[in-house]
């Protein structure tokens, strides 16, 4: 992508980051999060909701834009265009991560998309528009959408639409799918991997495989938090993808950290490590997470209510009197993240720069990820967060 981003796009990315951390905090506040790992793709959800905003009118459009952090919907579309065309462009042919992203609009054959919506969806969101028969072939369309997602995510996401989720009352399905596979710049030696104790939130421990390294690492340490940056191999463009491990010092500090990030999105930028440091000990657990959610309740908790009810105004999507009766019944989202010695495989479907005054880390420290932590995958040049989640038990995969 371009070496510089316009100020308005950077501001939109800051809003997107805030949306990401608000969602992460909402997911972590779920009682099930105390015993289950979680992962989701904020950029996937953000793009999907931005596309819905393009087809919304009146108060519904305003509420969508406000939830996504934008006062003007044009900012959402400009950001989506940058994200889809540049941030999420594949870099495997130039030595970088394998990235695949696709948007889809599946509309019932009885309806016609409004030309203005279709043009925006195709030109800015690079969406593929397909006419389908929900009214008599709902099961076949379900299989078609699931097959599309499975193909984009190279088989990692299956059955995004549960059986029965589409029926003869469905008129429109908007979706996207994201796949990411990156290799670490400095890979771990699998021969050094060995099991050790990981402490759960209840104070008990389990034996789980840890990756070890004696190399210097990008680490910051302050405010009761240690942050590890693991860069992925960079391609021949300006993008730089990295995974971040956010480890609170306190065993039970995961939830307060999630709340802190939600309240102060700039907190992450202030703690991103800028230099490598020598380590006395370093160990990071391998983990794999697969999570499927129906996201409408989460979004309602963030104040997004109108698109899901009788007052929804999605009249800018289709050319039909029926447009006044359209509303969103559900938003399905699935994510998969795997971290091992060679790198990360991940998939999902559905700013003024801070001046840092970061204290230099100690010359030698430990980074031992032996209790619950947050993680995220970010494109550092733009600041776009692709995936975010938490691990409370590395042995749980779903």
Swiss-Prot record:
Residue ranges of the region described as RCL: 343-367
SUPFAM superfamilies tied to this protein: Serpins (SSF56574)
Listed InterPro entries: Serpin_CS, Serpin_dom, Serpin_fam, Serpin_sf, Serpin_sf_1, Serpin_sf_2
GO MF, any single term: serine-type endopeptidase inhibitor activity
Taxonomy, superkingdom: Eukaryota
Alphabetical keyword list: Protease inhibitor, Serine protease inhibitor
A Pfam family it matches: Serpin
Taxonomic lineage of the native organism: Eukaryota, Viridiplantae, Streptophyta, Embryophyta, Tracheophyta
Residues under site feature: Reactive bond: 357-358
Entry function: Inhibits chymotrypsin, cathepsin G and trypsin in vitro.
Name of the molecule in the record: Serpin-Z2B
Domain remark text: The reactive center loop (RCL) extends out from the body of the protein and directs binding to the target protease. The protease cleaves the serpin at the reactive site within the RCL, establishing a covalent linkage between the carboxyl group of the serpin reactive site and the serine hydroxyl of the protease. The resulting inactive serpin-protease complex is highly stable.
Organism the protein comes from: Triticum aestivum (Wheat)
GO CC term, one of those recorded: extracellular space
PANTHER family associated with the record: SERINE PROTEASE INHIBITOR, SERPIN (PTHR11461), SERPIN-Z1C (PTHR11461:SF317)
Entry's family note: Belongs to the serpin family.
């Amino acid at each position: 992508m371009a070496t510089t981003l316009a100020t308005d796009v950077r501001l939109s990315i800051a809003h997107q980051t805030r949306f990401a951390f608000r969602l992460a905090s909402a997911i972590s506040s779920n009682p099930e999060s105390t015993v289950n790992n979680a992962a989701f793709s904020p950029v996937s959800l953000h793009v999907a909701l931005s596309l819905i905003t393009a087809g919304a009118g009146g108060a519904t459009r305003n509420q969508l834009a406000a939830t996504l952090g934008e006062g003007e919907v044009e900012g959402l579309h400009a950001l989506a265009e940058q994200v889809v065309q540049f941030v999420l462009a594949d870099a495997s042919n130039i030595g970088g991560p394998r990235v695949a992203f696709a948007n889809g609009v599946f509309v019932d054959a009885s309806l016609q998309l409004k030309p203005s919506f279709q043009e925006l969806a195709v030109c800015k969101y690079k969406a593929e528009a397909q006419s389908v028969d929900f009214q008599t072939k709902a099961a076949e369309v379900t299989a078609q959408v699931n097959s599309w997602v499975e193909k984009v995510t190279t088989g990692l996401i299956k059955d995004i639409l549960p059986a029965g989720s589409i029926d003869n009352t469905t008129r429109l399905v908007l979706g996207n799918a994201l796949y990411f596979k990156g290799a670490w710049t400095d890979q771990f030696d699998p021969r050094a991997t060995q099991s050790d104790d990981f402490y759960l939130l209840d104070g008990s421990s389990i034996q789980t495989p840890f990756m070890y390294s004696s190399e210097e690492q990008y680490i910051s340490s302050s405010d009761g938090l240690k942050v590890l940056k693991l860069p992925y191999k960079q391609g021949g463009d300006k993008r730089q993808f990295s995974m971040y491990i956010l480890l609170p010092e306190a065993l039970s500090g995961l939830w307060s950290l999630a709340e802190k990030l939600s309240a102060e999105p700039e907190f992450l930028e202030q703690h991103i490590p800028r230099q490598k440091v020598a380590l006395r000990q370093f160990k990071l657990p391998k983990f794999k997470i697969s999570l499927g959610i129906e996201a409408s309740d989460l979004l309602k908790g963030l104040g997004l209510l109108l698109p899901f009810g009788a007052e929804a105004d999605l009249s800018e999507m289709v050319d039909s009197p029926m447009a006044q009766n359209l509303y969103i019944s559900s938003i399905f989202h699935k994510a998969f993240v795997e971290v091992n010695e060679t790198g990360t495989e991940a998939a999902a479907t559905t700013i003024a720069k801070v001046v840092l005054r970061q204290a230099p880390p100690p010359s030698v420290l430990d980074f031992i990820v032996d209790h619950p932590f947050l993680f995220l995958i970010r494109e550092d040049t733009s600041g776009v967060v692709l995936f975010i989640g938490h691990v409370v038990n590395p042995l749980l995969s779903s």
